[in-house]
C-alpha cells in the first residue's frame, strides 16, 4: 500500500514560524526514510495558524533535502495567480527534482 502525508504547516503560539517550516521539512525527510510515497503541502491564506501560503517555495526546500519521495501541492488557488506563472514554477520544480513533483 502506498501512503502519503498532507502537511499544512501549522504554527504553534510562541514558536517562531521558521521552526514550523523546518518542522515541515523534517517531517518530509522522516516520511522518505519510512518509505512514504508522497508528501503533499497545502496552500492557505489569511489563517492565523496555518503558515503554508507558498507551496512552491516549501516544495523546493523539501526537494533539496530529500532524494526519492514525491512532492506535491494539494492545491493551487489559481484565482490568485496567472496560470502560466504557476506552470512555469512547476516546470522549474520538475527540473530541480526530476520525476518527483506532482
What are these regions (language model features)?
Residues 73-81:
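Active-site nucleophile and cofactor-binding loops and adjacent substrate-binding regions
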Residues 50-54, 78, 85:
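Generic, well-ordered alpha-helical segments
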Residues 70-74, 101-102:
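A short, GP-enriched loop/loop-strand-helix hinge that lies immediately N-terminal to
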Residues 2-17, 80-102:
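Flexible, glycine-rich active-site loops centered on histidine and acidic residues
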Residues 1-72:
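N-terminal beta1-alpha1-beta2 module of alpha/beta enzyme domains
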